[in-house]
């Protein structure tokens, strides 16, 4: 079915003669066959969002509808790959057209010639339903790719064969109840705007270990949770996202560079192959899918890139994997929505954003969660969605930040003053929050006993108390404080500098296990408890603050994963001995 262009306005093209087309259908526009998607229909005229540069297009050019919605190809070959916002593989396009992507380039998302070794796990005669695993492919050394029956099919398996196949070759044949035969390949297609089905959704109960102490201990996120990372320019949103992509204890990471600088994607491409996953020793790239829709690419494709990423994540979730989707930045996506809304002459909402901004943001985040996967075997997978928000001037009262805060659970507020003070991660512990603290308390209690959560609450109380005392210090100076308040200020400083602050460039400190975090915080709070006891017995405050063990606590976070337990036990022993000596010295005086 084809129509004719009657209007071109930037990325928006209006064509007539498409009365039989549907909203969300993919179309080919003009002589270069640019990729577009129908946004709305009025009679036989269609408003089309074109995902490529439209210069040179004009009225009279032909538009052809494919009759298919915007879909992604799901199968072996996605991991370690880098796609643009509409799932075109950038390495293969570079081989075809060079560094600049030619308009209308049409390359399949999955390599059609590469052969994968398919190992059947289902047997002929098995009754299968949507989501059942029929075989596996060792896609990378870190990930076993499970080939599943598409969610819409069910029936009896009448043939299956193992061996080396391309993604389009038939590996099995399924006969449904009507007697129709369906050939199954290793590849599925799925519309990006429709979430993949699952059996049931459940409450997130396991934390996602990010290796970042301020996140894991103070503001944890659960696997299957949602989080926002808002902050002004230069406060470290992308660096936080990179750290999460590197060290999170998930099986697969989908990193969406949506409208941000190309150098940030380059950093990922250069660093990830060099870094190893702390859980299995494999290069991090083996578990990563990159979607690059950088600031110099067409704005319209940003809108698709978020949906492309979350659909790929749902596919891996259906295999029973824990997946993290990192979107950097959802603000650029919202700006793409605003531009298209303006071109469509829709009624603008606050600050020119469309009135449906909040519902679109909700559609993205609600696809996160912990699910019981479809299929007869019990599989549980999760999608954790973490979106960066870039409010102009760092003003989180703007519509994108506000809509995001109403939807997501965890809020890691980045602070430019902390970033400029070289405090990384620059997450403000006074304005951030996480409702998952109560949900995950049971898990922490089972792993570490009640002391973990008690220590967390004590640390938060000390940091909040320090904030109140700083007002007095600014007015009358530190000498006006009581010895107990001086100790609170000193402990808070230790918590800030020796616990919350991390060095992303030192291997020993870039990632902290839960146990190391627990022991480090316990050591700082033990100093606080012993110090209060010593001050009550008349110990000299200056002598207390200058003990050798306190200096060793400052270096304790750099202890290696193999030796930190012995190191921390030695520091605690030294601390008790030195504080006893300070008390004895105070009593003698």
Regions of interest found by a model, annotated:
Residues 217-218, 224-549:
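P-loop NTPase catalytic core
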């Amino acid at each position: 079915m084809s129509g004719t262009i009657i209007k071109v306005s930037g990325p928006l093209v209006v064509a007539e003669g498409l009365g039989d087309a549907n909203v969300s259908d993919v179309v080919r526009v003009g002589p270069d066959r640019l990729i577009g998607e129908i946004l709305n229909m009025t009679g036989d005229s269609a408003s089309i969002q074109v995902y490529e540069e439209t210069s040179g297009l004009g009225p009279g050019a032909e538009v052809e509808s494919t009759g298919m919605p915007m879909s992604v190809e799901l199968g072996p070959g996605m991991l370690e790959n880098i796609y643009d916002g509409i799932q075109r593989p950038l390495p293969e396009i570079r081989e075809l057209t060079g560094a600049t992507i030619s308009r209308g380039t049409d390359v399949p998302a999955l390599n059609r010639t590469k052969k994968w070794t398919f190992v059947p796990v289902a047997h002929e005669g098995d009754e299968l339903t949507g989501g059942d695993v029929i075989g596996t492919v060792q896609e990378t050394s870190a990930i076993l790719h499970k080939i599943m029956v598409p969610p819409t099919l069910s029936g009896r398996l009448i043939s299956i064969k193992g061996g080396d196949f391309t993604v389009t070759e038939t590996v099995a044949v399924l006969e449904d109840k009507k007697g129709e035969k369906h050939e199954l390949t290793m590849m599925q297609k799925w519309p990006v705007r429709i979430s993949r089905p699952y059996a049931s959704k459940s409450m997130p109960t396991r934390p996602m270990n990010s290796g970042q102490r301020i996140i894991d201990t103070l503001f944890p996120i659960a696997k299957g949770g949602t989080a926002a990372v808002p902050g002004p320019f230069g406060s470290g949103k992308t660096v936080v996202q990179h750290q999460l992509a590197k060290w999170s204890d998930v099986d697969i990471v989908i990193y969406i560079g949506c409208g941000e600088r190309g150098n940030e994607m380059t950093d990922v491409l250069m660093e990830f192959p060099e870094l190893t996953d702390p859980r299995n020793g494999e290069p991090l790239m083996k578990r990563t899918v990159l979607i690059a829709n950088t600031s110099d690419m067409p704005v319209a494709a940003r809108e698709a890139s978020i949906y492309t990423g979350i659909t790929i994540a749902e596919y891996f979730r259906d295999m029973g994997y824990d997946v993290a989707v990192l979107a950097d930045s959802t603000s650029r996506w919202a700006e793409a929505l605003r531009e298209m809304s303006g071109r469509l002459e829709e009624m603008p909402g606050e600050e020119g954003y469309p009135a449906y901004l909040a519902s679109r943001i909700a559609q993205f985040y609600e696809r996160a969660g912990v699910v019981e996967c479809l299929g007869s075997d019990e599989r549980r997978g999760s999608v954790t969605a973490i979106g960066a928000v870039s409010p102009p001037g760092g003003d989180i009262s703007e519509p994108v930040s506000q809509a995001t805060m109403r939807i997501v659970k965890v809020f890691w507020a980045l602070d430019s003053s902390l970033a400029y003070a070289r405090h990384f991660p620059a997450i403000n512990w006074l304005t951030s929050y996480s409702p998952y603290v109560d949900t995950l308390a049971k898990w922490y209690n089972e792993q570490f006993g009640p002391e973990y959560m008690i220590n967390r609450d004590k640390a938060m109380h000390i940091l909040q108390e320090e904030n109140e005392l700083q007002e007095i210090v600014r007015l009358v100076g530190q000498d006006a404080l009581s010895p107990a308040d001086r100790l609170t200020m000193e402990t808070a400083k230790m918590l800030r500098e020796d616990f919350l602050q991390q060095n992303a460039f030192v291997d020993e400190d870039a990632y902290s296990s839960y146990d190391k975090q627990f022991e480090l915080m316990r050591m700082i709070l033990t100093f606080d408890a012993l110090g209060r006891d010593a001050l009550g017995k008349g110990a000299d405050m200056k002598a207390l603050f200058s003990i050798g063990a306190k200096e060793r606590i400052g270096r304790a976070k750099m202890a290696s994963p193999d030796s930190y337990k012995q190191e921390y036990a030695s520091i605690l022993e030294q601390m008790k001995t030195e504080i006893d000596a300070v008390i004895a010295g105070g009593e003698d005086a």
